[in-house]
A protein has these predicted regions:
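Catalytic His-Asp segment of secreted/periplasmic serine-dependent ester chemistry enzymes
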Residues: 274-350
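Active-site segments of SGNH/GDSL-like serine hydrolases
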Residues: 235-239, 259-292
Length: 350
């Protein structure tokens, strides 16, 4: 997929947040991650719409909340839309599914593998108010991933290889959906961000497969194990949360790493801890994503680093809501979510 410049979630030096995703609720409210002194821009790039303060929304300086004006052109999501009527809902795996079964309250929950959320969410640029404590990102330990860090420092070509599930394949980035603003999936943002920072060429090959868990990579190594690359990014979890315990997950990931090292002994690894699912959907207990990240940390070494997407996702979601960050309603990121993934990966090399 065509690469695009990585847009940081926030600019720490000047306190500006860029293209932060928002979803207005049925009461006409949307939450910013931080209090804002000024809204610089509010838009929906998929619809090609720019919204005006006063005409479409209001904001009180110093507040983290936006409110819709009566008659506003801004889309919103009501409770009735989140839980559609079971009699009329098209349930997944219907090809035109607009809902999925198995929500925690027994009612269908909104679902879309198309561009519904891209057309309904909006993006805000804003100046934060006062002193803001932006989330800290995990970094490599001293001496970790020495081969790739040396190649980046020396501006030598670097090749990334990604294996994972539908999130990593690209769902529901607008570039993957082929709708504006055509934001690439996170692996391409990661590669372009490394290129910009290092000044050397960084390319990415994506071998992720929709619907798979980590056992798939172990079962079908011919899809990825023979591909030459400096860094193997392993990003499973979402489809493993319900089918295995963290210890088995770690064991399978270790086997994947050993398969790779048997062919390319110099390979280094990033082990991605998945975003959590929508807790309004499914029967799994809370904390599964966090437990699986903990299992990955047990695999860290000089040649392998964990990238804890779950922690940053949870921190951001706590200040907003899941529907501002999701691309399908239940377990995929939107453009903002893909940027968040890339932010965590790039943060390792800061």
């Amino acid at each position: 997929m065509k690469s695009a410049a990585f847009i940081p979630l926030w600019e720490r030096k000047n306190g500006i947040c860029r293209s932060e995703s928002l979803m207005f609720d049925g009461e006409g409210r949307a939450k910013l991650l931080f209090p804002a002194s000024k809204i610089l821009k509010l838009c929906n790039p998929t619809l090609g719409k720019v919204y005006s303060e006063g005409r479409d929304f209001t904001h009180t300086p110093g507040s983290d909340e936006l409110r819709l004006v009566p008659g506003s052109a801004i889309p919103f999501l009501t409770e009735a839309m989140i839980h559609p009527d079971p009699a009329t809902a098209k349930l997944y795996p219907h090809p035109e599914a607009d809902a999925i079964a198995d929500s925690v309250n027994g009612r269908p929950v909104i679902f879309s593998n198309g561009d519904f959320f891209a057309r309904t969410q909006v993006e805000a640029d804003y100046q934060t108010a006062g002193i803001v404590e932006f989330p800290e990102l995990p970094r490599l330990a001293p001496g970790q991933l020495p081969r790739i860090t040396a190649k980046l420092r020396e501006k030598k070509p670097v090749k990334l290889l990604l294996i994972g599930d539908s999130i990593s394949e690209g769902y529901n980035a607008t570039g993957y959906l082929k709708v504006p603003p055509f934001m690439p999936p996170y692996i391409d943002l990661f590669a372009s961000g490394l290129t910009e920072r290092s000044g050397g060429p960084v390319t990415a090959v994506n071998r992720a497969v929709n619907g798979t868990g980590c056992r798939h990579a172990r079962k079908e190594p011919e899809r990825w194990a023979g591909e030459e690359a400096d860094l193997l990014v392993i990003a499973y979890g979402m489809n493993d949360f319900g089918g295995m315990e963290p210890a088995e997950y770690a064991s399978v990931i270790r086997e994947i790493m050993e398969l790779r090292l048997g062919r390319f002994p110099e390979t280094e690894f990033i082990l991605v801890g998945s975003m959590p699912r929508n807790l309004n959907w499914g029967s799994l207990p809370e904390g599964r994503a966090e437990a699986f990240v903990g299992a990955l940390r047990g695999l860290e070494s000089e040649k392998a680093a964990a990238a804890d997407v779950c922690a940053l996702w949870t921190r951001v979601q706590a200040g907003k809501d899941y529907y501002s960050m999701t691309g399908n309603g239940v377990n995929h990121p939107n453009d903002y979510g893909h940027r968040l993934y890339a932010e965590v990966l790039l943060g390792l090399f800061a």
